[in-house]
């Protein structure tokens, strides 16, 4: 299954790297991002990483009526110290715009 994902994303990753190397920087990479490791190692950290995805290859659609911002706000309120937000579109119905919400 992982090889299937890798092959599906290979061309997209090449294009993103080409754009980056040409100096084209787009959101969410145009500003500093919180440190994932720092969130996990803070003394008051719960150590919980919450994952947001709109679909999965094995389960299909997952709660499409909730926006990424709503879901992630709920995860943070419930104690998550870090978020994993899937942006892969073909298999997980994600989008890079999820990272700017």
Residue ranges and their predicted role:
Residues 1-101:
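Conserved N-terminal beta1-alpha1 strand-loop-helix module at the mouth
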């Amino acid at each position: 299954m992982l090889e299937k994902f890798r092959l599906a994303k290979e061309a997209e990753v090449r294009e993103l790297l080409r754009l980056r190397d040409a100096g084209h920087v787009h959101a969410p990479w145009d500003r500093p991002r919180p440190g994932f490791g720092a969130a996990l190692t803070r003394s008051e950290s719960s150590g919980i990483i919450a994952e947001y995805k709109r679909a999965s290859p094995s389960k299909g659609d997952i709660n499409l009526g909730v926006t990424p911002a709503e879901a992630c706000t709920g995860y943070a309120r419930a104690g998550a110290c870090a978020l994993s937000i899937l942006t892969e579109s073909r298999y997980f119905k994600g989008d890079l715009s999820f990272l700017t919400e």
